[in-house]
Amino acid sequence: MNSKQQKKYFVGIDISKDSFDATLIDEFQKKLFYQKFEMNKSGFKSFLQKLEKFDKVLLQITVESTGVYFISLYNYLLNTGFSISVINPLLVHNFHKSMSLRKTKTDKKDSFIIALFTLKNPEILSKHSKQTSTMKRLCRERDKISEEIAKVKTEIKSDLNVLFPELEKHIDPFTKSMLLFLEKHSSANSIRKLRTTQIDAIFNKTKGNKVRMKSVELKKLAKDSIGNGDKYLEKVLSSKIRRLKLYQELNKEFDLEISSFIEQNQSADFDILTSIKGIGKITAQKFLIEVDNIRNFNNHKQLTAFMGTDPSLKQSGTSIMYQGRISKRGNKYLRKTLFQMAVSCIRNDSTFNAYYHKKRDEKKKYKQAVIATGNKLLRVIYSMLTKENYYCESYR
C-alpha cells in the first residue's frame, strides 16, 4: 500500500454479526468521527456517505479478519474504489497491549485501536483479493470432505465385512469399476446370481481403474463366501457408495479450484515451499492460503504467534514463566497443517529428522518434539519465502 505520508485519514472497523463500528482518525491521531452502523445495505450506504466527505486517495480503511462477517462489507468497499486492508486480529491485539491502554473492552475503542494500528503500521497492511477469505473456506471445506471420504470408506469396509468379507483380501473395493459394481450388487449373495457376461458388462462401463480380477474368479469368490445376504444392509452399503462418489467428485472439483488459485496468485511461493522434502501439494496449498502473504509478518516470531505454536506464558508480579505448552491462540487450521508438514519432513528430510530425535533425546514427548520440529520448519519456511530461496538439507 501507499506509505503513511501519502495517506492522511485512517478508518478502523470492528465487525460483529449484525453491526459494525467505525472510527476515522487523521494523521495526527485526531478522531474525526465514530459511528455504529447496521450490517445491511442501508448501513453500508450510510457508512459510504460518511466516507465520501474524504478524498479516497488519502483514505485507508482496515478491518480485522474476524470469521466471515467482514467479507460482505470488504467487497462492498472494494467495489466502490476504496483502499481497504484486512489485518490479523492477533497483530491488533499485541499492538493494543503495547499501548498500555485500559483492559476494558468496548467496540468504540476497538475500532479506534484498529484505526491507530493502520496509521502506525502501514508497511504490514495487505490488500487482499476478493477471493482470499472465501478461498480459505473452500480449502477448509476440502479438508472436511477428505475427512468424510476417509470416514465413509471405513464404514463401507465394515459393511462389506458382513456382506462379502473375502472381497477386500483379493481386490481393491474403491476402484471406479468396483464401486459401480458394488453400488448395484452389494453382497456375495447378489453376485452369485449374476452371469459372468453381466459382471463383464458392468466392469466395462468405466474408463481406467479396471478391476484386476476376471468375472469368473469374482463369481467363484462370491460362491464360496461366508457373507450374509441382507437386503437392508445392501441398501445401506449402496447408499454409502453413492455418498462416497459424491464426496470424491466434490473433492476433485475443489482441488481444481484451489490449484488454479495457487497457480494464479502464489505459484512462486508454492514452488519454493514444495522444494522441502515432505511438503506436498495439498499441505503447501493449505499453508499458503491460510497465511495469505507471509511478508505481512515482520519476523518468524510473529508468524509463530499467528499460528499459536509459541510457548504460553504465565506472569506473576514481575516474573514471567514459560509453561511448556503452546499458546493455541492463533489459527488452528495452520497449526494442524504445520503438524502434518512436520511429521512428513521428519520422515523425509535428514535435517528435520535429526532435530526431532534431538528433542526426543531431551526427554520431550512425541507431540512436543513434533511441535518443536514444526517451529524449526516454520523458521526455515519464513526465511525461504521472504528471501525467495529454494531449500537444501543444510538450510538452517
How should each PLM-predicted stretch be described?
Residues M1-R396:
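A detector of single, family-specific signature residues
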